[in-house]
Amino acid sequence: METGAGIGLYPLHRCKTIYLVRHAQGIHNVDGEKNYKAYMSHDYFDAELTQLGWKQVDSLRKHVHSSGLHKKIELVISSPLMRTLQTAVGVFGGEGYTDMSDVLPLMVANAGNSSRAAISSLNCPPVITEESCREHLGVHPCDQRRSISDYQFLFPAVDFSLIESEEDKLWKADVRETIEELAARGKKFLNWLWTRKEKEIAIVTHSGFLFHTLNALQNECHPDVKKEICGHFANCELRSMVIVDRSMLGSDSSVTDYPGKIPKGIDLPSDAVVDDNNIKVE
């Protein structure tokens, strides 16, 4: 039987499922979609979500729960900007927060002018931040982050330990990251995922980061699959994908494979057996 073009096999323990999410609508998106120059405005420094954006968060959260994804996702990785953090905790965080001295909330009430109640860190995957999945760096104030201590106050249970500097040393007012640099950063981020033990990971990031990273990785895909992978993400869109460890960066062990031959016994395959006349017997 002939196999279809492009069909292949890969060990499960060398694969991860990633759930890619673009942040919900930010205040910069509203004017920026009408006039690109609006992205240059300092009024949109580290832009937060609009009220429509929060409704988009609510809709995606409902889907994540109704589809059962909330039970599968082991880790949430967020770009350390206001709009991605708000999206990450709003979609994947716990239910309404009850003030408890020994449990910090993922988000305090009204963080980033949200007019939202605090969000619980209970019964949800951990949320961590990583700078390498930030938006296109430089020039646009909406893509500049604030100090980490500011975020830690607003998002107490989010883990910021992977961020190396208190202030934003990556964003430059007069230098825009090239597309090639952005795509290379995206590939580096995906390689970094193989240092993580988690197999099902949600990543809350940005349109430019997703578009240029995914377009740099789709060369071997069928044209129809390329369209599925590489098209621009809508606000609060989620796409589920599998990444494969071809470079042997990940674990060499599988938790689901079973070695067999327990108890031990004769198990020579039938097509390897030969009779006295050296004729293969099958």
From Swiss-Prot:
Coiled coil: none
GO-annotated cellular components: cytosol; plastid
SUPFAM superfamilies: Phosphoglycerate mutase-like
Active-site residue list: H23 (tele-phosphohistidine intermediate), E135 (proton donor/acceptor)
Gene3D superfamilies according to UniProt: Phosphoglycerate mutase-like
Marked site: Transition state stabilizer: H206
Pfam families: His_Phos_1
Function: May play a role in carbohydrates metabolism.
Family affiliation: Belongs to the phosphoglycerate mutase family.
Protein name: Phosphoglycerate mutase-like protein 1
